[in-house]
Curated annotation (Swiss-Prot):
Keywords noted in UniProt: Cytoplasm, Leucine-rich repeat, Nucleus, Repeat
Claim: RNA-binding is one of the keywords in the record: no
Domain of life: Eukaryota
Function, as annotated: Plays a role in T-cell signaling pathway.
Originating organism: Xenopus laevis (African clawed frog)
LRR repeat boundaries on the chain: 662-683, 686-706, 711-731, 735-755
PANTHER family hit by this protein: C-MAF-INDUCING PROTEIN, LEUCINE-RICH REPEAT-CONTAINING PROTEIN 73
SUPFAM superfamilies the UniProt entry points to: PH domain-like, RNI-like
Record's protein name: C-Maf-inducing protein
InterPro entries xref list: CMIP (IPR052813), LRR_dom_sf (IPR032675), PH_CMIP (IPR056429)
């Protein structure tokens, strides 16, 4: 029979070209030069018909034995030829049938296939492939030309991958191995097949090769990296290959291969990775790559340019996965700096004491030394020996620390009442260090210091981007750092820049993350407040945080009560130094009757009168109190309706004109009042019914009303812009019996929550809402 090759849809193997070197020669730090860097070839990607890689399929099979006698020629002629239907599977090492009978009783190994061709002789069966095997030929007939070509390319791919697995599993000469790797990469790039395994299979073969041959020279490292670089443009490296890349970053951080080849790989990882938990070595590779950038002469400037390249020149980063991935890398790297300290045998007892709170907070006594290092000479000598042998990254320079809980009578009483023997200690209580005593000093090794400085600096860079700051604040709100880092002065001092950026941001979704995630846990506000473990500036950052929080929606009794219970001393000290925010805080505490103790009230008044700004604001407070007494004096109307189009200023002017102590029903329907009028409404002591129909009264105003008008019985919010954020606050108004939320942004969940928490609620209007 006359069998000839065909072009298979016009696709042919490319010719491999060797072009100019990718990186040229590069001078090493010590003045010596590396060997010539391997060349990078101009690779022409396949541009013809594309096919999906077949793993299995139905096809007709005919086997022909090579004729050796006249009788066998007759028996194998086309007139006696027989076709069998088979469901064939293209396994990793052979071609097998789901029904191993007839021609396919035995599987056909790829190593036994000498050639794969398309049949094109005259009068040949249509859409056939010819597999040349020892002693005969196997014909495969597809249903159409596309399926025939798909089978042809899939069989060729499986056969070649099988061959490369065999060849590269036993390397002898690395010159030959490198040539085979380049050919393998070219084959993958030029293949007309489309499948994830087309690029992943060569990477896994090379990855296995590298994992089994660890004693490679630097030149061989770089040659292999450059050879496989084209495959990494659109694919993540396998885990073993990540280990190889990490090793190269650690050993040759100044290699140009790191910049030329690894940069696009890391950029792709940061843009497309969805979960480092499923591929932790990708995170480790990214971490080592950034550290390699930091080792260059420009250092952090190179890292800064890399972060800028990830963000892009526009105001908003177009890649939503970049920030979470960079933060994940930073958190893991920072934890690694303290990992040996956490796991250290010598330090574990006292750290366990700190973390688990073996002494109850309310029962702790001051000046109880907790030994971190034993002073026994034998133990010290043993420690020195072990240090020299394993290069410890953490040294504790003091022999003892004194842990002291911040004392506040009110807080301690609450802790005694609410905390059981097995409760988790408060983070601040665990880490407060008595300033008068010998403090713990965590000294990291030079390498750990560089790692810490690099990644804290990256967090500072991230906080400088306006579009990244809200997401960064949410990611850092749970304080995802080890307690040992929070006890490290260097770390908290550097991280202060990030917290300062949060405190300066006017957006509520940013500065609200300064507070704790949930009740009973500490947030950045507590850590950087006076008495907190991270406070080193006499409360300047604390004042900034209070200022921004009070300026949004946190001017509430609950927030002021928390400050009065926990931070009254620092507030008074800062007010004494003329801080206007703290002066305002003290005035609000007096105005809202937060402070019940007369002596404390007198002390606050004395503090206010000690500065010009405090004296002025206290006088204004006294004027407001006199006006409030006049307003709340018995008398005046019991019902009042403002004209339509009235504003907040009109309402304030009206309420300042006389006594409204008897006012029970106030209608502001169809006026132009906003949430700002809530400050006037809370001055009405007898108010029972409030109509805000079709006004601009919003969530911020509802929160104020819910704290002060707890006796309100009827509230009409029809056609107001209130949402779940404000409506949830109504759950504290237990006297409400009639509530109109018609045409608001009420959700079904919030409605159910309000019904459960308002026992006196009888009439509710939720028409034209999600809860309707």
């Amino acid at each position: 029979m006359d069998f000839t090759n065909s072009s298979c849809g016009g696709s042919e193997h490319r010719q491999i070209e060797e072009n100019k070197p990718l990186l040229g020669e590069m001078s090493a730090t010590g003045g010596s030069k590396m060997g010539a860097v391997p060349c990078r070839r101009s690779l022409l990607h396949f541009s013809g018909m594309r096919y999906k890689l077949l793993q299995e399929g139905d096809i007709q099979v005919c086997a022909i034995r090579h004729p050796r006698t006249f009788l066998s020629k007759i028996l194998t002629s086309k007139f006696l030829r027989r076709w069998e239907p088979h469901h064939l599977t293209l396994a990793d090492n052979s071609l097998t049938s789901a029904t191993p009978t007839g021609y396919m009783e035995n599987s056909i190994s790829y190593s036994a296939i000498e050639d794969v061709q398309l049949l094109s002789w005259e009068n040949a069966p249509k859409y056939c492939l010819q597999l040349t095997i020892p002693g005969g030929t196997v014909l495969l007939q597809a249903a159409n030309s596309y399926l025939r070509d798909q089978w042809f390319h899939s069989l060729q791919w499986k056969k070649k991958i099988y061959k490369y697995k065999k060849v590269l599993s036993n390397p002898n000469r690395w010159e030959v191995v490198l040539k085979e790797i380049r050919t393998l990469v070219d084959m993958a790039l030029s293949s007309p097949l489309q499948d994830d395994s087309i690029h992943q299979a060569p990477l896994e073969i090379i990855s296995k090769l590298l994992s089994e041959n660890i004693n490679l020279t630097t030149q061989e490292h770089e040659s292999i990296i450059v050879a496989i670089a084209p495959l990494l443009e659109n694919n993540h490296p396998p885990p073993d290959l990540c280990e190889f890349f990490c090793k190269h970053c650690r050993e040759r951080p100044r290699s140009m291969v790191v910049i030329e080849v690894f940069t696009p790989v890391v950029q792709r990882i940061l843009k497309h990775n969805m979960d480092f938990g499923k591929c932790p070595r990708l995170r480790l590779f990214t971490q080592e790559y950034i550290l390699a950038l930091n080792e260059l002469n420009a250092g952090m400037e190179v890292v800064k340019k890399f972060i800028y390249s990830m963000h892009g020149p526009t105001a908003n980063c177009p890649h939503p996965r970049v920030l979470p991935n960079v933060v994940a890398v930073c958190l893991a790297a920072i934890y690694s700096c303290y990992e040996e300290f956490i796991n250290s045998r010598d330090n574990s007892p006292s750290l366990k004491e700190i973390r688990n709170g073996c002494q109850q907070q309310c029962d702790r006594k001051p000046n109880i030394p907790l030994r971190l290092l034993h002073t026994n000479p034998d133990l010290v000598s043993q420690e020195v020996t072990s240090t020299e042998s394993r290069h410890k990254s953490v040294v504790v320079t003091s022999n003892e620390i004194l842990v002291e809980v911040e004392r506040n009578n009110t807080v301690n009483q609450k802790l005694k009442a609410n905390t059981g023997n097995d409760s988790e200690p408060n983070l601040i209580d665990c880490l407060l260090i008595c300033p008068a005593c010998s403090t713990i000093s965590i000294e990291l090794s030079p390498q750990a210091d560089r790692v810490l400085a690099c990644y804290v600096e990256i967090l500072k860079m991230l906080s400088d981007y306006d579009d990244w700051r809200p997401a960064l604040a949410i990611l850092l709100q749970p304080i995802p750092f080890p307690k040992e880092a929070l006890a490290h002065e260097t770390f908290t001092k550097e991280l202060k820049h990030v917290i300062q950026r949060f405190a300066e941001d006017p957006r509520q979704e940013v500065h609200s993350c300064l507070l704790s995630v949930r009740a009973g846990k500490d947030g950045w506000f507590q850590l950087y407040s006076p008495g907190g473990v991270a406070c080193d500036d006499d409360g300047e950052l604390f004042a900034s945080m209070v200022h921004i929080l009070m300026g949004s929606c946190y001017k509430t009794k609950k927030f002021l009560l928390s400050l009065a219970e926990n931070k009254l001393g620092p507030c008074m000290l800062l007010a004494l130094r003329g801080n206007q925010t703290m002066v305002e805080i003290l005035c609000l505490m007096l105005e809202y009757n937060i402070i019940e103790n007369n002596d404390t009230q007198l002390q606050i008044i004395s503090t206010l009168e000690s500065t010009d700004v405090g004296k002025r604001m206290y006088e204004q407070l006294c004027d407001r109190q006199r006006e409030l007494k006049e307003l709340q004096r018995k008398g005046g109307p019991t019902r009042l309706t403002l004209p339509s189009k009235s504003t907040d200023a009109d309402l304030a002017r009206l309420l300042s004109s006389g006594s409204f102590g008897n006012l029970e029903n106030l209608s502001l329907a169809f006026t132009n009042v906003t949430s700002a009028c809530a400050e006037q409404l809370i001055k009405l002591p007898s108010l029972k019914q409030l109509n805000l129909w079709s006004t601009q009264f919003g969530d911020a105003g509802l929160r104020v009303l819910s704290e002060h008008l707890t006796t309100l019985q009827v509230l009409n919010l029809c056609e107001t812009p209130v949402s779940d954020a404000g409506l949830l606050a109504l759950s504290s108004m237990k006297s409400l019996c009639n509530l109109n939320m018609n045409s608001t942004k009420l959700s079904a969940d919030t409605y159910e929550d309000l019904k459960a928490k308002l026992p006196n609620l009888k009439e509710v209007d939720v028409r034209y809402t999600e809860a309707w």
